[in-house]
Swiss-Prot record:
The keyword Cytoplasm does not apply. May be involved in transporting molecules across the outer membrane. The keyword Hydrolase does not apply. Its absence leads to imipenem resistance. Coiled coil: none annotated. Keywords: Cell outer membrane, Membrane. It comes from the Bacteria. This is 29 kDa outer membrane protein. It is found in: Cell outer membrane. GO terms for cellular component: cell outer membrane. Its main location: membrane.
Length: 24
């Protein structure tokens, strides 16, 4: 996935969500 991991968080769809709890 083209998500930028930052501080154990992933930027996806302009939202900050914990890595591992990302919804597809």
């Amino acid at each position: 996935d083209e998500a930028v991991v930052h501080d154990s968080y992933a930027f996806d769809k302009n939202q900050l969500i914990p890595v591992g709890a990302r919804a597809e």
